[in-house]
């Protein structure tokens, strides 16, 4: 795994250009998130020319097998050149997946640390949590975000928890109607 952020993207670009991921069978790129020990300063911006260069190189090279986490998918969609859209698995938070913490709180995404979208499984079933108004509100933010965007069906609305990590520079990004 390779965490891709402001502090690592130059190295990632250089390694792809120079084919210097020695004896590596496959690389999974995980987008840096400003959670836990993650710093806001390491969040990549879609306007950074290195972001476009990284995705163009990544999708042009055939020397490595690679994968990306679902948070990185908007970057692939917006900057990648040669990939199969069906190979991408975008964010499914609250739609097809959820996270259950050790204290039995269910949230749409493991990066939701605010408590705003949590449902207590000591008082509710998983089905009740999934069908709850709390989860509906979360899903609707994604469902109605980015109106008119031609890539909405592939990106599914980016990230409502941390919009700053969405590698998209379209004016429709995260706008909710």
Located regions from the model:
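Flexible mid-to-C-terminal extensions adjoining Fe-S/redox cofactors in radical SAM and related proteins
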Residues: 106, 110-177
């Amino acid at each position: 795994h390779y965490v891709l952020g402001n502090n690592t993207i130059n190295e990632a670009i250089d390694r792809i250009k120079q084919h210097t991921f020695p004896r590596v069978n496959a690389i999974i790129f995980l987008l840096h998130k400003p959670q836990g020990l993650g710093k806001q300063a390491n969040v990549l911006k879609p306007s950074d020319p290195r972001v476009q260069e990284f995705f163009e190189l990544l999708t042009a090279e055939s020397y490595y097998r690679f994968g990306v986490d679902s948070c990185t998918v908007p970057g692939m969609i917006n900057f990648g050149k040669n990939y199969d859209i069906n190979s991408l698995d975008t964010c499914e938070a609250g739609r097809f997946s959820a996270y259950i913490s050790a204290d039995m709180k269910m949230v749409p995404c493991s990066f939701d640390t605010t408590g705003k979208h949590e449902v207590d499984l000591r008082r509710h079933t998983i089905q009740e949590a999934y069908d709850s108004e709390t989860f509906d509100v979360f899903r609707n933010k994604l469902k109605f975000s980015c109106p008119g965007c031609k890539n909405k069906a592939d990106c599914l609305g980016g990230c409502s928890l941390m919009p700053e990590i969405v590698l998209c520079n379209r004016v429709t990004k995260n706008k909710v109607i």
